[in-house]
């Protein structure tokens, strides 16, 4: 459950195998996710959790770098850090995946429901929770899964602590970042900011990305806590260009989000959480003639959003219920300033009222995990989402888990491609079944396998010849396999294989890679960790076999090497040097020749803590 390729582990000792403990197969260490406050052994869904320490060992710049290593998650292309990219989870595209930061959605509902994971910096992140499969009963619009990002909290032991980091690489690609945090008298603070700039590791893919996040907490007498957060990000980036076809595309993305949260313990077995949030999301898409610098397409969108939630948790992780009420309003404004294509302009307001309940009921080795959610939307159909999951312990080292669910995702909140000039009100919906097992029965080895089958309908598909949006039914089934070993003299191995077969339900035709991700995906990693020497090394591999049109390079294996060396290993605040060599063998991967994965490139940097 708590897996990322090359996560470091402690050696097996008299306290038992760290692999067993970290996966929740013992009761010593909880590993739940935010909406499901349970130990890892009581989660029916297919979940991966990535921690801040694991992220640091990858020398990652953004969430996209981290997702590249997560089993079952695939990116279309990794190019320059901070660039725009697409992604999928077990064949479900990014339009069906909810992305949140501290409970604030990041998806542009008017722009393919895309959240820009390449524009979420990792320095602020405490952990990333990836739920692979329909999760609407707890999360709402999440037909294909959830990427939930939890940012760091203020440190409690010191009045001030911090970090400064800098790196430089190919094509003047730089990443400058810093953070400062501390607590005193019940008040805590966490501040971070930085920039990523590049002339483009790939031609036409230059990046100018700035970001900042602040968080203030106050602990009341009696255990209540208030948290105020503000997140600001902007990015101007080149997307692609081609001298052969004489065109270019650039984009810009702006995020300004804030929230205020209050958590109040009502008793030993009851907690109330109240949150208010709001912000603005802006996006621009510019396309033009490269030789003349003239635009033939210039689209802008703005989404002003606000939301309020109240949730009550009763009981504990083994016997409990979490219920909640939510309200959300999103104002959408769209303009296309050159072609004035019909349906490209819009002024809409989407409102959503929601109520949900999720529970855990444990009897001996069996746990039942039901959930239900009801949404009322002013512009769309009203969905009812439900899930029923279960886990069953088979001894102390093997766990069966599975769930069946019905969920939804929002359609495009736009008139673009409309047949009748009206907004499509039918939701994109899914029924899913997943089941599998997780075991540490083999000494020093952890294994997990999940089988999945998804039936999806009302999937929007733009017909470029007719200029209209059509809908289709799709089915996806496959298997997601993972393994990892306990360390041996500092070395550890992880591996994963994902098979996805995506079909058009009506015709039986295989879906292309843009609709269902790669048919075969293999991820593996070899790590070495020597705490006494202050050295950690990570070698990752990522193989993907995409179903793409002729002329593409759909099959490739990308290898990356990351090395971190502390100069004073005995000190927690030791300065640290690091370097990364990405795409070691300069593999070629692309759908179109003018938009390729990043070639081999190198970067070096350092971190200083205080």
Regions found by a protein language model. Give the residues of each.
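Membrane-embedded beta-barrel scaffold of Gram-negative outer-membrane proteins
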Residues: 272-287, 330-333, 393, 399-403, ...
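Flexible loop and strand-edge segments within Gram-negative outer membrane beta-barrel domains
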Residues: 198-205, 225-305, 343
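Short acidic/polar hinge/loop motifs at secondary-structure boundaries
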Residues: 86, 104-132
């Amino acid at each position: 459950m708590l897996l990322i390729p090359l996560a470091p582990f402690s050696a097996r000792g008299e306290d038992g195998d760290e692999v067993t403990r970290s996966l929740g197969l013992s009761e010593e260490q909880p590993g739940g996710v935010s909406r499901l406050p349970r130990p890892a052994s009581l989660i029916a869904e297919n979940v991966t959790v990535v921690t801040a320490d694991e992220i640091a060992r990858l020398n990652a710049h953004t969430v996209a770098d981290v997702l590249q290593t997560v089993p079952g998650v695939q990116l279309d292309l990794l190019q320059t850090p901070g660039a725009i990219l697409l992604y999928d989870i077990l064949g479900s595209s990014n339009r069906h995946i909810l992305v949140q930061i501290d409970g604030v959605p990041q998806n542009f509902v008017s722009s393919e429901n895309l959240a820009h994971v390449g524009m979420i910096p990792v320095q602020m992140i405490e952990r990333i929770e990836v739920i692979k499969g329909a999760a609407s009963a707890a999360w709402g619009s999440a037909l294909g899964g959830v990427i939930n990002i939890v940012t760091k909290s203020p440190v409690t032991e010191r009045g001030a602590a911090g970090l400064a980091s800098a790196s430089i690489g190919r094509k003047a690609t730089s990443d400058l970042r810093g953070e400062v945090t501390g607590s005193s008298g019940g008040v805590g603070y966490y501040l971070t900011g930085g920039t990523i700039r590049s002339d483009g590791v790939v031609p036409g893919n230059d990046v100018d990305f700035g970001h900042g996040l602040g968080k203030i907490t106050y602990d009341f007498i009696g255990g209540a806590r208030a948290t105020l957060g503000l997140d600001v990000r902007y990015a101007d980036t080149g997307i692609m260009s081609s001298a052969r076809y004489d065109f270019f595309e650039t984009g810009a993305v702006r995020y300004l989000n804030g929230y205020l949260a209050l958590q109040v313990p009502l008793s030993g077995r009851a907690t109330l959480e109240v949150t208010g949030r709001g912000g603005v999301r802006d996006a621009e898409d510019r396309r033009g003639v490269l030789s003349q610098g003239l635009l033939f397409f210039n689209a802008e969108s703005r989404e002003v959003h606000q939301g309020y939630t109240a949730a009550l948790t009763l009981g504990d992780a083994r016997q409990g219920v979490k219920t909640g009420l939510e309200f959300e309003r999103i104002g959408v404004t769209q303009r296309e300033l050159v072609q004035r294509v019909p349906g490209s302009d819009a002024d809409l307001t989407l409102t959503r009222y929601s109520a949900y309940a999720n529970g855990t009921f444990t009897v001996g080795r069996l746990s039942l995990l039901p959930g239900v959610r009801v949404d009322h939307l002013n512009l769309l159909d009203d969905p009812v989402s439900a899930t029923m999951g279960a886990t069953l312990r088979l001894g102390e080292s093997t766990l069966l888990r599975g769930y069946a669910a019905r969920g939804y995702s929002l359609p495009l909140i736009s008139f673009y491609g409309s047949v009748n000039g009206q907004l499509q009100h039918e939701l994109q919906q899914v029924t899913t079944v997943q089941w599998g097992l997780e075991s540490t029965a083999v000494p020093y080895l952890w294994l997990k396998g999940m089988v999945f089958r998804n039936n999806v309908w009302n999937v929007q598909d733009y017909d470029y010849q007719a200029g209209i949006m059509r809908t289709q039914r799709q089915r996806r089934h496959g298997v997601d396999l993972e393994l990892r070993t306990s360390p041996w003299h500092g070395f550890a191995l992880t591996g994963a294989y994902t098979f996805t077969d995506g079909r058009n339900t009506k015709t039986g035709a295989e879906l292309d890679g843009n609709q269902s991700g790669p048919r075969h995906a293999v991820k593996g990693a070899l790590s070495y960790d020597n705490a006494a020497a202050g050295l950690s090394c990570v070698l990752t591999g990522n193989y993907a076999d995409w179903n793409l049109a002729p002329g593409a390079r759909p099959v490739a294996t990308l290898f990356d090497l990351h090395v971190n060396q502390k100069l004073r290993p005995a000190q927690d605040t030791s300065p640290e040097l690091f370097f990364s060599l990405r795409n070691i063998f300069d593999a070629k991967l692309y759908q179109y020749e003018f938009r390729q994965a990043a070639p081999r490139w190198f970067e070096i940097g350092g971190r200083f803590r205080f």
